[in-house]
Amino acid sequence: RGLGDVYKRQAQGLIDADQLGWDNPAQVPLREMANVPMRHLKTMVEFELGTIAATALTVDGLKACHVGNGNKWQAIIEPSTPGFRVSVTVNNTVSTTEVSAAASPTDGVFLADYRYTVPLVLNGSELTLGTIGVGSWDEGAGGTAQGMTPTHYRIEGLENRTIEVYLAGSDSPTQITLDAKGEAMQQAGVPVGIVARIACDGTQYEIGREESSQISLRIVDGKVAFREADDKGFIPVNTIAELKMIDLDNASRGRKYLQQGNIDLLDAEWTPISKLEGIYDGSNFTVARLRVSLGNGNAGLFAANGGTIRNVVIASASALRGQWHAGMVCGENTGTIERCTNRASVTDGGSNTLGGICGYNNNGTISECLNTGTLTIDATVPSDGTGGIVGYCGKGTITGCGNTGGIGGKPSKTGGIAGQADDCQIADCYNTGDLVLPWGAGDNNGGIAGLTYNATLITRCYNTGTVTVEGSQAGGICGQLNAGATISSCYNAGKVGAKWNSGGIAGQSTDAEIIACHNDGLIESQTSGWAGAGGICGFHKGTITACYHIGQVTGDSAIGAIVGEHNSGNISYCYWNGDLEGIPAGGGGSQTGNEKFGAAWPQPSTHEAWRTTAETPAAYWRTLGSAGGGYPKLAWEK
């Protein structure tokens, strides 16, 4: 019904809102907007100002959201009375008008689920005619306004065509007609759905985008083509179809790409992009519902990377399995991966390597990446490594990365950062996730790395997660440290346990070096009899210098505050507290200057490895503490 009366308010400015009349407004049902859980009278208002080039528009003092092109604006308001105030800025001049109405619902004020389209008459030097559309929603439980932002389609090549829009899980399309620019606006439904695909003249194009978003495509001769690159040479990507285009040919794989929105892969079988040679920047938008289950070649969003992948976020995945290497971001990396995140949890049934970010880092660089997902190995074949960041690292670097996700199942060579490291540099990384592996799991598991050798260096890393395994060689930092490998300036504060050979820093060390590290965590044997459990190392055949232990060590025999068994090599200038011997008698190795806290305290003059940054900027320690004044702190440690 019409509102009947005309409400007039006078406003000052270049444009005088002399009359705002509501006379027999068209009431158009907006069922696609209904049932949004909003408070009563929370209202969406659309303003179309015709030819006036408004530079700003506010509603009740709130900045309106500019949508579309030209003069179309949209705002969400919550008036305290049945009315609202509109301010329009044109040529730096502000004009304000108020709209009010009687509070009686019989007058038809702000009826739920309806949009009111009324004429807006603006008198002044610039006369135009536009519309105000008001859509309001009934009283609900409160919450966010799902579905309020419309989907904006911009499809070059389908101008003036009608397209069919299919939501995920539905075979009933909605028809939308694009204008002469290939554009259309569609109000999103509630709850927000995923646009799975669109079709035109029988040809379908994969989308994978949430409603209430910008969906852009370029169609040439009925096929998807890349859109124009930006001023930095990056080609925009915001749909499944465009993502698949990267693997079109060698030239495509060498270009630069910029992800423009969240992409949902719809849990359909994904064929990994074979090898990126250019740059892919995910812009911290997400990729969801990744599924690679066929077990062929490498598995991941990318099969291999020889270029640069950055700012990619894997939000979820249902399967990840490769014949060789599996990683959420990529299977094998020979290039650079930086600032990427995996949140997905998966179970792998047979890949040789599995990583939260990358399966096999082959002389590549991985930096500032994070895994929060749980990785589970459910396989009867041996694994070459499972890690929160990387399964296997060979002659590469991993810096500034973290893992908070758990690792379970029956893997071997497992690490919070890297499962296996061969001549790999791991620096400034941390693990807080738990590695809890049952009977039947393999050996060599550590908070940072599982198995290391050949000039591998682990430095400035820490672990606070639990590392327990029914097998052998468990360490807070590394499970097994082999010939040529070094751990320096690291600490463990997590619980560590194994059937044999468990240590706060390393479960076993053979012809390797541990220097300037400390353990604060509980070390325990998971069996009776010979344990090989130590605060720094369980079974030792290498070199340990300037380390200390202040945690606990439990077990039947072959246990010590520094090492469980000192088979060979040298241990020097290490300290501990508690009732245990630092180094049990009977081993074949040598030792120098090892003391219990209280009997002695480390000093810079004790050994050069105990120098502090006050004397030597590159020293391992920031402070050495004192009896009753705290224990030594590493240079980087808080």
Predicted regions and their residues:
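A short, solvent-exposed loop/turn motif at the edges and junctions
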Residues: K8-D23, V90-T96, V195-S212
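Predominantly extracellular beta-rich ligand-binding scaffolds that present long acidic/polar faces
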Residues: V220, A225-K638
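Short, acidic Ser/Thr/Gly-rich low-complexity loop/linker segments typical of extracellular
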Residues: K63-N71, G169-E183
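Short, small-residue-biased leader/transition segments that mark boundaries at the very start
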Residues: G2-Y7
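Short helix-loop boundary/capping segments
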Residues: W22, A26-P82
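Structural motif
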Residues: E46-A54, P150-L167
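Conserved "repeat-terminator" motif of extracellular CCP/Sushi domains
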Residues: M33-K42, I77, L120-G124, Q146-T149, ...
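Short Pro-Gly-centered beta-turn/loop motif in secreted/extracellular proteins
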Residues: R1, K72-F84, D179-V195, D201
